[in-house]
């Protein structure tokens, strides 16, 4: 993964106000009425980068405080640190087992990437995702960047930018950012590998699907903002997909949020998306788009999908007809989970982070 802005550098944005607003689609007049928010109850406070979390049927929270490197359990008002590590994300649970991801590295390279699991008795296991990525690199044959620039134009691009904007395949990178634990398999949204992975109970990793890239046409504004020569204007730039979360729908398909690569806020438009992925065949379908930072999603039992828009300051809802509208305005949301008829959302993730529970009506 090589891109102007990457999830690996989100921690550097702590304290920065991100106020770019998305303009969501509205539900068709004759379509089903989307849900609206009811009461809002705070369930965890004073968190440091709660980018991902999970909630159990009894209300216990397992929280990845990414910027602090903490995996925290909150139950009955009491908080307990279960694990420490670098860049903790991809938190999910199944019964008394909790899964999370750890990453060591920066925007340029990754030094370690692990999928971790902790059982009820405190036993922790680790799967080396970086070793698998180095051996397999599922998007190695993809084509990203500018693909049709003349040689004299390429020569004008600053050398330090050329690996990011020149034509290139998927680099060796992995960032276990979202996960979903099921009985015999854990699915991973890998924001570095640009793919959805499956990890079986023996720890074997396989590729479910590589998400499709998105594209934009370079404008004068884009060229100026990134220090690119004017000869790139009017050319198509292919950006890498950035899978951020994965959930199972009631139709048996996986639902996956993705950032667009390149600038991941709305500075070049709200380009985040939700995809449907067939876990048996790897087929990928675009389900909805136009999100300003689609970093987390939840699927209700009736098939309604909720999407956290980190840079849009809202949670959006997608009806079963595929119509998108705003569900609730919340500051800098990241994770979103559904449990027992309520929506749980992590908010203010770049400052004094919180998790709230929102009723529906």
Predicted regions located by residue number:
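Secretory targeting and sorting signals
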Residues: 1-29
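Extracellular beta-propeller repeat domains
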Residues: 27-361
């Amino acid at each position: 993964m090589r891109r102007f802005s990457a999830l690996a550098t989100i921690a550097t944005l702590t304290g920065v106000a991100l106020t770019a607003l998305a303009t969501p689609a509205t539900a068709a007049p004759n379509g089903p009425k989307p849900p609206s928010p009811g009461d809002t109850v705070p369930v965890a406070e004073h968190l440091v980068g709660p980018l991902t979390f999970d909630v159990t049927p009894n209300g216990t929270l397992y929280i990845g405080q990414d910027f602090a490197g903490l995996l925290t359990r909150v139950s009955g008002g009491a908080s307990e640190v279960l694990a420490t590590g670098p860049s903790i994300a991809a938190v999910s649970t199944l019964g008394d087992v909790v899964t999370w991801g750890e990453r060591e590295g920066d925007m340029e390279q990754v030094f370690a990437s692990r999928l971790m699991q902790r059982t009820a008795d405190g036993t922790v296991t680790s799967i080396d995702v970086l070793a698998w990525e180095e051996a397999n690199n599922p998007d190695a044959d993809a084509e990203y960047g500018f693909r049709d620039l003349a040689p004299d134009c390429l020569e004008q691009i600053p050398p330090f930018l050329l690996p990011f904007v020149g034509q290139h395949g998927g680099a060796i990178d992995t960032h276990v950012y979202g996960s979903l634990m099921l009985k015999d398999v854990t699915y991973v949204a890998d924001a570095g590998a640009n793919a959805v992975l499956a990890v079986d109970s023996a720890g074997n990793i396989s590729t479910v699907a590589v998400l499709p890239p998105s594209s934009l046409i370079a404008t004068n504004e884009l060229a100026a903002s990134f220090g690119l020569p004017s000869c790139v204007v009017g050319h198509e730039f292919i950006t890498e997909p950035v899978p951020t979360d994965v959930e199972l729908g009631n139709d048996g398909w996986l639902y996956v949020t993705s950032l667009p690569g390149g600038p991941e806020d709305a500075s070049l438009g709200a380009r985040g998306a939700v995809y449907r992925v067939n876990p048996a065949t790897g087929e990928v379908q675009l389900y909805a788009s136009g999100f300003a930072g689609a970093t987390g999603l939840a699927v209700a039992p009736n098939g309604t999908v909720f999407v956290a828009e980190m840079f849009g300051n809202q949670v959006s809802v997608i009806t079963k007809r595929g119509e998108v509208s705003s569900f609730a305005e919340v500051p800098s949301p990241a994770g979103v989970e559904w449990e027992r008829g309520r929506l749980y959302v992590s908010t203010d993730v770049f400052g004094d982070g919180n998790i709230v529970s929102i009723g529906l009506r």
